[in-house]
Amino acid sequence: MNAEDVKGFFASRESLDMEQYLVLDYYLESVGDIETALAHFCSEQSTAQWKRVGVDEDFRLVHAAKVIDYEVIEELEQLSYPVKHSETGKIHACRVTIAHPHCNFGPKIPNLLTAVCGEGTYFTPGVPVVKLMDIHFPDTYLADFEGPKFGIEGLRDILNAHGRPIFFGVVKPNIGLSPGEFAEIAYQSWLGGLDIAKDDEMLADVTWSSIEERAAHLGKARRKAEAETGEPKIYLANITDEVDSLMEKHDVAVRNGANALLINALPVGLSAVRMLSNYTQVPLIGHFPFIASFSRMEKYGIHSKVMTKLQRLAGLDAVIMPGFGDRMMTPEEEVLENVIECTKPMGRIKPCLPVPGGSDSALTLQTVYEKVGNVDFGFVPGRGVFGHPMGPKAGAKSIRQAWEAIEQGISIETWAETHPELQAMVDQSLLKKQD
């Protein structure tokens, strides 16, 4: 690529109609001349060849991705990760902002991903290390997406749960219970105060617990709990399956008693999520399998907040994500970035509920609340409710009691002195520390 060719892949924001472009933030490591590498990077993900032989034309004017800003962070002695490559020369770590014309792929998530994190992005000469850090959508692009059907306020209205977090619980044992056993445990947790009892992301439609039978048992238990507590409840059924079975699984689950649906968004694909969101009349909630496999490395892959943003765009009403606990191996800053992506302004797209989770209990609720900074989040313990020494009803009560302490401005330990379910969690924690 000669010097004039390179210039065709650079532009200023002021020279472009930015409503016609997505803005992409990348971290990358280039080998050799930086601007030549960046020009190749833009070319490979858009106009790899921009004219026909012997024809006076240039498709870059409309269709080329263009560098609108870049910063050289530092020169490196070697790449951050060993990647086989043919180029030689100095290695530079860079932050790069690219404007990519969305006319190249339209309002279609599979085509968008093919362009901005596909072959052209990760197989560019001179750019062996790449991480997509963020995507910014213009309102003209967002106008073609429906986004969440219910969102945060819709979920709150269904549950009549305002001014506090929404309390989920992952029914445990997560694998192995019969539908009847599963329903009894969920029922007890609803009596104790959970808003939502959910299937584990690994429990879907299996021979020993079909979605039809499980939804029927849970629907009956849910209605009984609602009658006894006077509170609306949700059974969140996992319908993750082959794409050609999703609509059938949706209908079976809802018809038999599920009033919200769980979907493992990346394993089934965001296009499938969008299809379900457009079809369903109940809340659709996503889980995070598969995402860490390409987001965890600091300088390669795709930042997890990009996937959260795309899940919201595809129509999820809530996004379950790795939370603050040490087991989740996610920096606090990254968790908060994902939480913010659920609720920040996004054109006409409604906010979705962030649900950061992992090894939570009544004893971590205050920490999560303080870190999130408001009540617009879901709190999703598993063993923190269903492994409670006094049983799942007491486990759910301990969550509600912890929230009461927070509302009253009283320490968990002090509030626990007059609330035995919460005290049991405090005592259990002390025993673990002694071990």
UniProtKB/Swiss-Prot annotation:
Protein family per UniProt: Belongs to the RuBisCO large chain family. Type IV subfamily.
Alphabetical UniProt keywords: Magnesium, Metal-binding
Entry keyword annotation includes Metal-binding: yes
Binding site for Mg(2+): K198, D200, E201
Region forming the signal peptide: none
Biological processes annotated in GO: carbon fixation
N6-carboxylysine sites (modified residues): K198
Organism, scientific name: Chlorobaculum tepidum (strain ATCC 49652 / DSM 12025 / NBRC 103806 / TLS) (Chlorobium tepidum)
Cofactor section: Mg(2+)
Cofactor: how bound: Binds 1 Mg(2+) ion per subunit.
GO molecular-function terms, A-Z: identical protein binding; magnesium ion binding
Name of the protein described by the UniProt record: Ribulose bisphosphate carboxylase-like protein
Presence of the UniProt keyword Magnesium in the record: yes
